[in-house]
Amino acid sequence: MAHKKAGGSTRNGRDSESKRLGVKRFGGESVLAGNIIVRQRGTKFHAGVNVGVGRDHTLFALTDGKVKFEVKGPNNRKFISIEG
């Protein structure tokens, strides 16, 4: 005869692995062509001059230069471009 009542099971206890999103190179930093500037879900930041967009909306440098963040347009969108 059991002296302790059996405990029920829980349906919790899982968590997904973090995706390491965010800005990888900040304004004024030097980058080489191919360097990842931002990893993001959707287009929180938009691609400006000399910046490419990956399939998962990752922004990366197309040329060597310095990273520049700017807010432009009627909707105040954040653009990232590479200067010089």
Swiss-Prot record:
Keywords: Ribonucleoprotein, Ribosomal protein. One of its GO terms (cellular component) is cytosolic large ribosomal subunit. Residues 1-22 are annotated as: Disordered. PROSITE patterns: RIBOSOMAL_L27. GO terms for biological process: translation. One of its GO terms (molecular function) is structural constituent of ribosome. InterPro entries: Ribosomal_bL27, Ribosomal_bL27_CS. It comes from the Bacteria. Belongs to the bacterial ribosomal protein bL27 family. This is Large ribosomal subunit protein bL27. It comes from Shewanella woodyi (strain ATCC 51908 / MS32). The lineage of its organism: Bacteria, Pseudomonadati, Pseudomonadota, Gammaproteobacteria, Alteromonadales.
